[in-house]
Swiss-Prot record:
<dbReference type="InterPro" id="IPR036890">
    <property type="entry name" value="HATPase_C_sf"/>
</dbReference>
<dbReference type="InterPro" id="IPR013507">
    <property type="entry name" value="DNA_mismatch_S5_2-like"/>
</dbReference>
<dbReference type="Pfam" id="PF08676">
    <property type="entry name" value="MutL_C"/>
</dbReference>
<dbReference type="InterPro" id="IPR042121">
    <property type="entry name" value="MutL_C_regsub"/>
</dbReference>
<comment type="similarity">
    <text>Belongs to the DNA mismatch repair MutL/HexB family.</text>
</comment>
<dbReference type="GO" id="GO:0006298">
    <property type="term" value="P:mismatch repair"/>
</dbReference>
<keyword id="KW-0227">DNA damage</keyword>
<dbReference type="InterPro" id="IPR037198">
    <property type="entry name" value="MutL_C_sf"/>
</dbReference>
<dbReference type="InterPro" id="IPR020568">
    <property type="entry name" value="Ribosomal_Su5_D2-typ_SF"/>
</dbReference>
<dbReference type="Pfam" id="PF13589">
    <property type="entry name" value="HATPase_c_3"/>
</dbReference>
<dbReference type="GO" id="GO:0030983">
    <property type="term" value="F:mismatched DNA binding"/>
</dbReference>
<dbReference type="GO" id="GO:0032300">
    <property type="term" value="C:mismatch repair complex"/>
</dbReference>
<dbReference type="InterPro" id="IPR020667">
    <property type="entry name" value="DNA_mismatch_repair_MutL"/>
</dbReference>
<dbReference type="GO" id="GO:0005524">
    <property type="term" value="F:ATP binding"/>
</dbReference>
<dbReference type="InterPro" id="IPR014790">
    <property type="entry name" value="MutL_C"/>
</dbReference>
<dbReference type="InterPro" id="IPR014721">
    <property type="entry name" value="Ribsml_uS5_D2-typ_fold_subgr"/>
</dbReference>
<dbReference type="InterPro" id="IPR014762">
    <property type="entry name" value="DNA_mismatch_repair_CS"/>
</dbReference>
């Protein structure tokens, strides 16, 4: 049996570092939290290669005295608490005294620091936990931490670091969350010598949101502010039509500390229930202030998890406040969405008032986006500064719609359906049924020499052949044909695109931008034509017809969320979009069809294989035999 050995300090520190230093992003978190605790009013973060090779955090805080510099790198040394009782009252972000010791154990560190009352600064260089150089230097008041070559001495940890883009995205998320926690601090974030964002440090949360996220993000938020003895709650929540595919933009702070909380998420999502689609999540930036004794932040080494001592009260407070704000803001939200130009507003309503027959004519003459459809676009010269309405052009001269679409042109003629049975069939009728084998035979053999009787309720095509009557759901039939067409395009990676008359420039948060650029290969086969366009922006020159007319570009954010969650675009998501597109383009119930249109639709149905169901699973074809009809009339038993 092996003997029990006492590990040396170097090994202990490397192992312990794993609890604190998960990667470059956790180093950034610890260093910036230290800078905030030091009272800095200006903090700069600079990274290179996703923080794996270089991280610099500079603040103008109180600095560290020359007497305390060495102690700062010792484990469990801190200026923030002195006893266990202090944990229940501390407002500082750090308190364990482990960060610098852990970081210096697995990287190369330079620290330059100077307190206000000291005439010189101290430069300290540490490699693998050992001080290699220390000297006096001239420097401004504050502290600069430079971290190089993370995990240089722990190859297994280095091997499992994520890609540069992925690490950059995690750091971008972390710095944005920390900037939002401290609106009174001016933050500057630099990635590979490019300034990503700066915040003004004017003390207003709205200023930080506008600096960190895209303009559209802030425009869709609702302010929330509650001040009660037991709890203060302030920040922003999203309008009900501004949601994401995951919870990554549910941002919570408790007493200024960035945390993740299932309890708070559940309270907010319950308030939104019934107001937003299933599997969508509201966006929020909320700061909660409570008595420090009512929360335990020492749950996890990352200090992002929290345990509330009064969970039920917290849940109900948040749920009630969010519910109230949503109910009060519904009217305001509608007013804010009114376009600034009166003519545009009137035209929008005019388009909605087009009667059904006109809409159907358009939908059957062209598969895709109509020139009358408007989208919100950005002027290329001004990049993402302002959005203006522009027309979208379908520039697909070589892409031919299916034959039935070209031939189905609604006319004023209406078939005489007086010969159709006028009495309603009993609901419990056993005569109407679906049968795959019957459908197969019907498609391949019996769709010949039939007699068109007409339309029933302008929704169902009625045909007669031999001793049977067949009912065809015109919408379901056309929808299935379009679904197959679009699905085949996707399988062959020949998805038709629509060129935008004016390309659209979209601005993203840095983390979303990095995710999109890193996974751009997921978007190209879907029919997108897009590329990087300046800082945190992409330009879209074409979008897939598959995704229907681009009234807005929320589907881009949905796809980004898919990639974040699943590492790729889920097939189910694409299938759902195909179904939606097919449903919108298909002939509708109450469309009046002439005899030529009906015959063309039936000819196209010959291409289908059973089961004859629409993409939603509803039957396309039903049959009623003469024998069954005679039984209904009691002519036979």
């Amino acid at each position: 049996m092996p003997q029990i050995k006492l590990l040396d300090n170097l090994t202990i520190n490397k192992i312990a570092a794993g609890e604190v230093v998960e990667g470059p992003y956790s180093i950034v978190k610890e260093l910036i939290e230290n800078a905030i605790d030091a009272g800095g009013t200006a903090i700069t973060l600079e990274i290179k290669e996703g923080g794996k090779k270089y991280i610099r955090v500079t603040d103008n805080g109180i600095g560290i005295s020359s007497d305390d510099v060495n102690r700062a790198f010792m484990r469990h040394s801190t200026s923030k608490i002195s006893s266990l009782q202090d944990l229940s009252t501390t407002f500082s972000l750090g308190f364990r005294g482990e960060a610098l010791a852990s970081i210096s154990a697995v990287s190369q560190v330079e620290m330059i620091t100077k307190p206000k009352d000291q005439s010189y600064g101290i430069l300290t260089e540490i490699e693998g936990g050992e001080i290699t150089n220390q000297k006096k230097v001239g420097c401004p008041t504050g502290t600069t931490m430079i971290i190089k070559n993370v995990f240089f001495n722990t190859p297994p940890r280095y091997k499992f670091m994520k890609s540069t883009q992925a690490e950059t995205a995690r750091i971008s998320e972390m710095i944005s969350r920390l900037a939002l926690s401290s609106p009174h601090i001016a933050f500057k974030y630099i990635n590979n010598q490019t300034t990503i964002f700066t915040t003004p440090g004017d003390g207003t949360l709205s200023s930080v949101i506008l600096s960190v996220f895209e303009k559209n993000f802030f425009q869709n938020l609702i302010p929330l502010s509650v001040n009660k003895p037991a709890l203060e709650l302030d920040g922003f929540i999203s309008q009900v039509d501004f949601v994401r595919g995951n919870r990554s933009f549910q941002i919570f702070y408790v007493n200024g500390r960035y945390i993740k909380s299932k309890l708070i998420s559940q309270a907010i999502e319950e308030a939104y229930k019934g107001k937003i689609p299933i599997n969508k999540y509201p966006i929020c930036v909320l700061n909660i202030k409570i008595d420090p004794e009512d929360a335990d932040i020492n749950v996890h080494p990352s200090k992002t998890e929290i345990k509330f001592h009064k969970e039920k009260e917290i849940y109900h407070y948040i749920y009630n406040y969010v519910t109230q704000v949503l109910s009060e803001s519904s009217t305001i939200s509608e007013i804010m969405m009114i376009p600034s130009t009166k003519n545009q507003h009137q035209q929008h309503h005019h388009l909605k008032e087009i009667n059904l027959s006109q809409e159907n004519i358009q939908s059957k003459e062209s598969i895709g986006v109509k020139q009358q459809d408007k989208v919100m676009v950005a002027d290329e010269q001004e990049k993402v500064k302002e959005y203006n309405s522009q027309y979208v052009m379908d520039s697909r001269p070589k892409v031919q719609p299916p034959p039935m679409v070209n031939t189905l042109k609604t006319e004023d003629t209406q078939l005489n359906v007086a010969s159709i049975i006028s009495n309603e069939l009993p609901v419990e009728s056993r005569g109407i049924r679906t049968n795959p084998q019957l459908q197969k035979n019907f498609i391949k053999t019996y769709l010949q020499n039939y007699k068109v009787v007409g339309q029933l309720f302008n929704t169902y095509i009625v045909i007669e052949k031999d001793q049977s009557v067949y009912l065809i759901d015109q919408h379901a039939a056309h929808e299935k044909l379009l679904y197959i067409q679009f699905h085949e395009e996707l399988k062959k990676e020949t998805v038709a695109s629509q060129q935008l008359l004016t390309p659209v420039v979209l601005e993203f948060s840095h983390e979303d931008y990095i995710t999109l650029i890193e996974n751009i290969s997921e978007f190209i086969p879907l029919g997108f034509e897009l590329e990087a366009f300046g800082q945190n922006s992409i330009i879209i020159r074409a979008v897939p017809l598959l995704l229907d007319k681009p009234k807005d570009y929320n589907f881009i954010f949905e796809l980004i969320d898919q990639v974040k969650n699943e590492k790729h675009v889920k097939p189910d998501y694409i299938r759902e979009k195909i179904i939606q597109r097919s449903c919108k383009e298909a002939i509708k119930a109450m469309d009046i069809l002439d005899i030529q249109e009906i015959q063309q639709l039936i000819r196209d149905l010959e291409k289908l294989e059973p089961p004859l169901t629409c993409p939603h699973g509803r039957p396309i074809l039903l049959t009623l035999t003469k024998n069954q009809i005679e039984k209904l009339f009691k002519r036979i038993q």
